Amino acid sequence: IKEGGYKCGWKNEQNMHFYSFTEGKFGYPTMIELFSRKPGYHLEIEEGIIPIHIDDDTSSLSAILLNDDFYKFMMSGRRVVDGIGVLGAEHLIPFKMYAWINLLDRKRAGEHVNEKDLKKHKYDVFRLLQIVTTGIKVESEGLVTECIHRYIEEISAVDESEIRLLQMGMPFDRDRGVELLKEIYL
C-alpha cells in the first residue's frame, strides 16, 4: 500500500472507511480492499467492520469482516498475481450483490442510506459482469448463494426503465444481464 502510493480511507455518510485503498500509482491495482474472516469469538461490534492495530502510525486501519460462507467463497476465487491475492470479477460480483441487498433492506427498514451507494452497487454488478470470462461457472453455497438468488429476484422486479444499462454503454439490457448472472451462478 505504501509502495503503491495509495490514498486510504473514504467517507460515506458519517463514517470513515480505512479498509479501501484507491488512487495508487500507475501499474498498481485500481483498488485494494482488506478482508478478514470472522473470528471464533464474540466481538463487541454491530457492523461488519473491525479495527486492526498494526502499529502506532496505523491506528485507523480496518477490514471488512466476512462470515464463513463469504470468506470461503472469497478464498475459492483467490488468485495470486505478483505475490498479491486478487479476485476476478466473477468472485467480486456476489460481494456487490450483497452490498446492494444490504442497503436496500436498510432503506426499506426506514434507515437513511446514501442513494449514490445504492445505485453504485446495483450497477457495479453489471459493470463487472462485462469482464467475466464467457462460459465460466462459479459455485457458491450458504449465504453467498442466498444473496445471488435474492439479487436476481430483486433486480428482476425493478422496472427495466429504471435500469438503463444500454444507455450506460453496456452490451446488454437488464434481462440479458440477469440471464448471464443465472448462467454463471445458478
What are these regions (language model features)?
Residues 1-186:
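Compositionally biased terminal segments of proteins
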